Amino acid sequence: MKLFVLCIFAMMATLAMSRSWTYVQPKFLNKAFEVALKEEIIVRWDRKLAKWLRVNGGPLSHVQKKALYFVNRRYMQTHWANYMLWINKKTDALGRTPVVGDYRRLGAEIGRRIDMVFFYKFLSGRNMIPKYMPYMEQINRMRAADIPVKYMGK
């Protein structure tokens, strides 16, 4: 139930960001570009979570804190196609061939713009942090670059 509610909120945030249901036409994405995006997004969100945990994480158990790190990774996986929609617009607007630095900058902007602190407050305030499961541990142990997403490059 907790994970279901989390998914509903993730869907609402996606709709608020995209303002429409749009099919993202698959487009070749270089593996280096994908890695740069993932690393920057996760680094920004993990920083926000670490800062939030320092201030508000006292009542949370160690397992609940690990579950919140999983929330970061699952949120990125869930919304990857929408991020690519936005990234395609931004890279097309460059007027040149994008480089890894452009994707790092865009990943950092996604990580900065999306207010994950709202989700941490919501989940912890309503005691809705998902129960920590073995599959969560597997994803948490992965490097940001290795987290599987749909719409991957070749």
Swiss-Prot record:
One Gene Ontology term from the biological process aspect of the record = single fertilization
Q: Name one Pfam family in it.
A: Egg_lysin
Taken from the UniProt entry, a GO cellular component term is:
acrosomal lumen
Question: What tissues contain this protein?
Answer: Sperm.
**Which superkingdom heads the taxonomic lineage of this protein's source?**
Eukaryota
What are the alphabetically sorted keywords of the record? Answer: Fertilization, Signal
Which InterPro entries does the entry link to? Egg_lysin, Egg_lysin_sf
Which SUPFAM superfamilies does the protein's record reference?
A: Fertilization protein
What start and end residues bound the annotated signal peptide? 1-18
Q: What does this protein do?
A: Dissolves the egg vitelline layer nonenzymatically during fertilization. It creates a hole of about 3 mu-m in diameter through which the sperm pass.
Q: How does it assemble?
A: Homodimer.
Name listed for the protein in its UniProt record = Egg-lysin
The organism is Haliotis kamtschatkana
